[in-house]
Amino acid sequence: MTTCLIVDDDPKILEYVSKYIEREHFETIVQSSAENALSYLETHQVDIAIVDVMMGKMSGFELCKILKEDFDIPVIMLTARDALSDKEQAYLTGTDDYVTKPFEVKELMFRIKAVLKRYNVNINNEVSIGNLTLNQSYLEIQSSSKSMNLPNKEFQLLFLLASNPRQVFNRDALIEKIWGFDYEGDERTVDVHIKRLRKRLEKIDASVTIHTVRGLGYKVDDHV
């Protein structure tokens, strides 16, 4: 799943942008400051960053420079400042695109996809493993002879595992990616969803299985 980091000190912008992008089947990570964003990136990877210019101690210009030089992440800047000098500064710091507020989030989505295409980031809504094809737009899994629609969280969980075959994910990583970093429920919800997915996979195609790696987490294997 394509991951988009959104950095803005306005909670309304964070909610507005993240909700729309998630409907396009992207994973979103929201941070309210440049410092928090950099702390997150010390242990996580993202595919693109949407960065507001005017923030607290560290400006969006400074953050963009670091993201480009140290992390090589595509960046789109958001700002209410539309002076030519501001645009020049943004591009000099390395931004890939520049969007002025107020903006249509649909247009922002077009720009995100265009930038990702230039970086050859796969934003395909389908992934195949074994004899199965997972279609993210319809929350559907298909084999050669059967198809099945899954509940959203179950599908996203399977899609993540299938997109990274044989990679082991622990519960914390799965919860953060599927339920969000602010999830406060029982971590055993992962086990419940995995159990349901195993039963569904048995019905549609036994060649794809979810394995428990004792003490580590879960991974998907295919036996084709």
From Swiss-Prot:
- The positions making up the signal sequence are none
Name the UniProt record assigns to this protein: Heme response regulator HssR
| PTM text | Phosphorylated by HssS.
Ranges annotated as DNA-binding? 124-222
- Which UniProt key words apply to this protein? Activator, Cytoplasm, DNA-binding, Phosphoprotein, Transcription, Transcription regulation, Two-component regulatory system, Virulence
Keyword RNA-binding attributed: no
One Pfam family, short name = Trans_reg_C
What this chain does, per the entry, is described as: Member of the two-component regulatory system HssS/HssR involved in intracellular heme homeostasis and tempering of staphylococcal virulence. Phosphorylated HssR binds to a direct repeat sequence within hrtAB promoter and activates the expression of hrtAB, an efflux pump, in response to extracellular heme, hemin, hemoglobin or blood.
Where mainly found? cytoplasm
Please give the CDD domains that the UniProt record associates with this protein.
Answer: REC_OmpR (cd17574), trans_reg_C (cd00383)
State its location(s).
Cytoplasm
Q: Name one GO biological process term.
A: regulation of DNA-templated transcription
Keyword Transcription regulation attached: yes
Molecular function per GO: phosphorelay response regulator activity; transcription cis-regulatory region binding
